[in-house]
Amino acid sequence: GLLLNGKRLFLRGTNAIPTQWLAGYSEEMAQRDVALIKEAGLNAVRVHAHVTHPAFYEGCDREGVLVWQDFPLQWGYAPDEAFAQEALRQARAMVEVLGAHPSAYLWCAQNEPTHNRHALGPLLGAALRAADPTRPVKEASDFREHPYPGWYWGHYRDFLALPGAPLPSEFGAQALPRAELLRRV
């Protein structure tokens, strides 16, 4: 499990994927999103495959919401040395910009990598560890550890052997909380 200040912490989290262009994501919207996270009784958020508005991180710091921060790499990329060097530069810059936020508790190097998982993951993971040796680093949020049994594949009993444990990066699927709401849709 996760330890925070020497005490076990059970994470109750969600995923933050922007529903609008980041250029249009205002300070007020960021503050509202953090307030909604708190209102939902959550204590953690994964900023999924992007770096978001500074006000979001400031709000998470203020409200005690932990941030799993993805580096904005999604799926596959050409095995190009210039691309790898630019990704390294940006990973270091992300830590420089966000590393002072006490809410940031984990860096993740890429989301759902395909053919390049064994190239970019270790490369960026090492760069993130070197830039911030105080936080854990996950080399990839790998689709093979995203349990959606009964939704995309598998069976609901597959939850008994949780892939990515103890900290899966994705879990479950979209659902309405009550059958009556599903009938309304």
Model-derived regions, located:
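N-terminal carbohydrate-binding accessory modules
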Residues: 1-39
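Substrate-binding/catalytic cleft of secreted carbohydrate-active enzymes
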Residues: 44-185
